[in-house]
């Protein structure tokens, strides 16, 4: 049975419906999931009329519950029934209420096990008073870790949506170690990496230059890295962000832990504007496109749907990887560890049916 994926429509006056519709008309999407859009049917129809002719004949399967979702159809649950005027490019009270109603309903269905993963289209933070990541952490089990993903490039954050003035107080040894632990666990369970290599970025220019430009590296970040190593986490650094990304050094790691939002997102988006925001650390799977509401291009048929499509596929990939990991760790097989060609440890499981062992008693 294909997993049911909840897709919240986001801000009704932004590009959410546009990127969702364009993404779902990629035929392969329906081969791996049953999508259910949480939004408003009337609003969806208005957005369709702003798109190319090929989208005009779309029909919706209007349902009341995810269990009614049909394979190969655009399933939609109407979550906000009040009069909902569409004012493209504007943040309004109606659009905020509609966005929150869709997210609340989708989260309720996710918690009830009616859907298997959540993909969220962009919202204006006024709708929630906070970001998606912080909202979800309060409603599901676990500690959140914001991670941006694009192929083998993964950038996680110590600090999410906080002002620059608040960052120094949040850069603590305990917090960095917690984020490193969450990141390491996610790379193993969600991405199938046996022994991930994690690069940790410095806070200050030139990694503090031995304390001349700040002491956070010596007093906080390096001790956190050392403690992570003691726990078996392959953490390295701290690295000055400019040289680390400018030299391409990031390609030698499975993930990067940045100290704050712009330190991580500026190089990430410079390298790829079609990445995905993944909320790691929680007991649910949630992804989203790595862009905002797009008020400036809403209704102009200019939105690039690739980030949304990548978010849909990443949700499926993580679901599969988690299932494989949980099955493997629930019934662990005996194994030996050998190094691969790059010197990384690799598990080789023992098959007792084909492998013969001689104990000391069998020897002459």
Spell out what each predicted region is.
Residues 163-168, 293-296:
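Intrinsically disordered or low-complexity boundary/linker segments at protein termini
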Residues 1-135, 174, 178-259, 263-277, ...:
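Contiguous, glycine/small-aliphatic-enriched amphipathic segments in soluble metabolic enzymes
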Residues 132-163, 286:
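Flexible loop/hinge segments that line or gate small-molecule binding clefts
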